[in-house]
UniProtKB/Swiss-Prot annotation:
Gene: FOXRED1
Membrane topology type: Single-pass membrane protein
Record organism: Bos taurus
Documented EC number(s): 1.-.-.-
Protein name (record): FAD-dependent oxidoreductase domain-containing protein 1
Family matches, as InterPro entries: FAD-dep_OxRdtase, FAD/NAD-bd_sf
GO function terms (MF aspect): oxidoreductase activity
Membrane-spanning parts: 66-82
Cellular compartments annotated: Mitochondrion inner membrane
SUPFAM superfamilies: FAD/NAD(P)-binding domain (SSF51905)
Keywords, alphabetical: Electron transport, FAD, Flavoprotein, Membrane, Mitochondrion, Mitochondrion inner membrane, Oxidoreductase, Respiratory chain, Transmembrane, Transmembrane helix, Transport
Function (record text): Required for the assembly of the mitochondrial membrane respiratory chain NADH dehydrogenase (Complex I). Involved in mid-late stages of complex I assembly.
Recorded GO CC terms: cytoplasm; mitochondrial inner membrane
C-alpha cells in the first residue's frame, strides 16, 4: 500500500511543481546597475577608496528556483541540463553552492578520470554510453563564444577486465548485456590475451573482456572547468559556502493501510559563508543534493532518516565518504604505450599515465582495511603490502617499479548496493538526489545530470529509465547491485 501511495503521489505532484515563483527580476541586471553606479561615484571622487555600496557579490541571492548543493561535476551537470532544457531562456534561476572552490578535496579532481561501459547493470551501461558521446562532442555541448575549445586529453585506450574461473560465467553474461545495450566489448581467452598483451601473466585468468570503443580516461579538471565556464555563460549563479540548515513545512497523509506519513517541503536553505559565522537564507522551490561523499549529512539536515526505524521516514541515505588511495609509479620496463586500464580479479588496477613510463593505480581495501576518512593522508604501507604484490604478480615487469607520488580522494560510497541515487525523495518532496555512485559518478555525470533535470522539469525520466536508482529502494530492500566496482 505504501508503495502504491508513493507512486500515486510522485506522478502528478512532481510534474505540477511550479518553478516560476522567483523568476521576476534579474540579478545580472542588478549587478550591472551597481557597477554603473560605482563607476559614476569613482568619477566624482577620483582617487578615493570610499565605497558607499557594500559589496555583496560573494553572497548568494535571496531567492533561487533551484539550489544545487555541491559544485562537483555531478552538481554542475544537473545545473547545465536544467538550463539547457528550460522552456524559455532565463526561465529558471539556478544556484550552485560549493564549500571549497579550490576543489582541493573534491572527488572529481582526485579521481583517475576513467570512463567505461563494462558494468553489470544495463542502466550503468546506458549512462556511460551517453556520457562518452557527450565527452566526444564536448565542444558542441560546452562551447562558449570567443573562448578557446576544450581539450579533455582523452586517451581511448580501453578497459581490460580480467576474470578468474569463478567469475568467468558472470563476465560472459555481463558482456552479452553490454553488447545488447550498444557497447563495443569483446571477450578474450587467455591465449588471445597473451598474444595481444604479452606483458601480462595470464596465470589464474580464465577470461578477459576488452572495451573497443568509448573507453579510456580523460582530464577531470578540464571537464570541471569547462562546465563552470559554460554555466556562467548560461547565467547560473555560484556561491562559496556550506549548507547548514533547511527550513521546511510539513503536511500529513494516510495510506490505505492506515500508515501515517509526514511530507516535508523545503522552503529555505541556509548557506554559511566561507570564513565567517554569517549565513544567508535562500528561498527556493527545489533542492538538489549533489554533495558527494557528504550527501548523507545534507540529507540528515533535511530530516531524511530521522523517523522511527523500519519506516520510510526512518530510512537514511546510505552514502558515506570512503577514502581511496591512488599511487603513481615509474617503470621503464613496463607495458608501454599500448597498455589499457587493467582491472585484476584481485581488485588491483592500473593504467598508463602520460608518455614517460609512468603508471597510476591502486586497489580498494576490504571492509576491515577501510582507512579513516577524516583526512586525506596516504598510507604507503598499503601499497607495499596490498597493491604492489598483486601488480607484480599480474605484470612481472612491475617488480622493479618505483613509487613517485600518491594522493587520496573520496568515493561517495553507497553502502546499500554501490550504485547511484537519482531522483526525488519520497517524503521530502522537493529534494532530489544525484549521488552515491561509489567511484563511477564522474564518468556518468553528463547522463545523470540530464536524468535529474528531466525529473525536475517533467516529473519523470525521459531518455534513460533510472527508476531502479530511486531512493525508495532503500526502504523496500530492492538492491540495484553493481558488481563491477573498481
Amino acid at each position: 500500500m505504501l508503495r502504491r501511495a508513493l507512486r500515486l503521489r510522485l506522478g502528478p505532484c512532481l510534474s505540477g511543481r511550479g518553478l516560476g515563483t522567483y523568476r521576476r527580476g534579474s540579478t545580472l541586471d542588478w549587478d550591472g546597475k551597481v557597477s554603473e553606479i560605482k563607476k559614476k561615484i569613482q568619477s566624482i571622487f577620483p582617487g578615493g577608496a570610499w565605497n558607499p555600496l557594500y559589496d555583496t557579490s560573494h553572497l548568494p541571492p535571496e531567492r533561487s528556483d533551484v539550489v544545487i548543493v555541491g559544485g562537483g561535476v555531478l552538481g554542475l551537470s544537473v545545473a547545465y541540463w536544467l538550463k539547457r532544457l528550460e522552456k524559455q531562456q532565463g526561465a529558471i534561476r539556478v544556484l550552485v553552492v560549493e564549500r571549497d572552490h579550490t576543489y582541493a578535496r573534491a572527488s572529481t579532481v582526485l579521481s583517475v578520470g576513467g570512463i567505461r561501459q563494462q558494468f553489470s547493470l544495463p542502466q550503468n551501461v546506458q549512462l556511460s554510453l551517453f556520457s562518452a558521446e557527450f565527452l566526444r562532442n564536448i565542444n558542441e555541448y560546452l562551447a562558449v563564444v570567443d573562448d578557446p575549445p576544450l581539450d579533455l586529453q582523452f586517451n581511448p585506450s580501453g578497459y581490460l577486465l580480467l576474470a578468474s574461473e569463478e567469475g568467468a560465467a558472470i563476465m560472459e553474461r555481463n558482456v552479452k548485456m553490454q553488447r545488447q545495450e550498444g557497447a563495443k566489448v569483446c571477450l578474450m581467452s587467455p591465449e588471445q590475451l597473451q598474444k595481444k598483451f604479452p606483458w601480462i601473466n595470464t596465470e589464474g585468468v580464465a577470461l578477459a573482456s576488452y572495451g573497443l570503443e568509448n573507453e579510456g580516461w580523460f582530464d577531470p579538471w578540464c571537464l570541471l572547468q569547462g562546465l563552470r565556464r559554460k554555466l556562467q555563460s548560461m547565467g547560473v549563479l555560484f556561491c562559496q559556502g556550506e549548507v547548514t540548515r533547511f527550513i521546511s513545512s510539513s503536511s500529513h497523509m494516510e495510506t490505505a493501510s492506515g500508515e501515517q506519513l509526514t511530507l516535508k517541503r523545503i522552503h529555505e536553505v541556509h548557506v554559511k559563508m566561507d570564513h565567517s559565522q554569517e549565513f544567508q537564507p535562500v528561498e527556493c522551490a527545489i533542492v538538489v543534493n549533489a554533495a558527494g561523499a557528504w550527501s548523507g549529512q545534507i540529507a540528515e539536515l533535511a530530516g531524511v532518516g530521522n523517523g522511527p526505524p523500519g519506516t520510510m521516514q526512518g530510512t537514511k541515505l546510505p552514502v558515506e565518504p570512503r577514502k581511496r588511495y591512488v599511487y603513481l609509479w615509474h617503470c621503464p620496463q613496463g607495458p608501454g604505450l599500448e597498455a589499457p586500464l587493467v582491472a585484476d580479479p584481485s581488485g588491483a588496477y592500473f593504467r598508463r599515465e602520460g608518455l614517460g613510463n609512468n603508471y597510476v593505480g591502486s586497489c580498494s581495501p576490504t571492509e576491515e582495511e577501510e582507512p579513516d576518512p577524516g583526512n586525506l593522508e596516504v598510507d604507503y604501507d598499503f601499497f607495499q603490502e596490498k597493491v604492489w604484490p598483486r601488480l607484480a604478480q599480474r605484470v612481472p615487469a612491475f617488480e622493479t617499479l618505483k613509487v613517485r607520488s600518491a594522493w587520496a580522494g573520496y568515493y561517495d560510497y553507497n553502502t546499500f548496493d554501490q550504485n547511484g541515487v537519482v531522483g526525488p525523495h519520497p517524503l521530502v518532496v522537493n529534494m532530489y538526489f544525484a549521488t552515491g555512485f561509489s567511484g563511477h559518478g564522474l564518468q556518468q555525470a553528463p547522463a545523470v545530470g540530464r536524468a535529474v533535470a528531466e525529473m525536475v522539469l517533467e516529473g519523470h525520466f525521459q531518455t534513460i529509465n533510472l527508476s531502479p536508482f530511486l531512493f525508495s529502494r532503500f526502504y523496500f530492500g530492492e538492491k540495484a547491485q553493481e558488481h563491477c566496482i573498481l
